């Protein structure tokens, strides 16, 4: 197996899944800049930047999953997941039970975690 950085492995896995399933979409803050190779290969309809509102775009991911897409929601820093927990815990996680099994919201949520960016305590979880 080739030796890859963590970022390269994520990029490769996303590209592999996006090539295999046209329902896989990626969105998040500056995701088109973070994943330029994916944006070039799959286009703006599948690699979509989102506004700086984690709760809004995670909720959009839940809706996209309910509509049949397979979203990968990239939250820039793990610190910001907390502001989006309502969509994740009260909607995505409980949807199947609340709907008697009629609805599901399969999605992936990714976030960077760790220090070293010099962005301050609310951006690093160092």
Question: Which role does the model predict for each range below?
Answer:
Residues 1-126:
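Thiamine diphosphate
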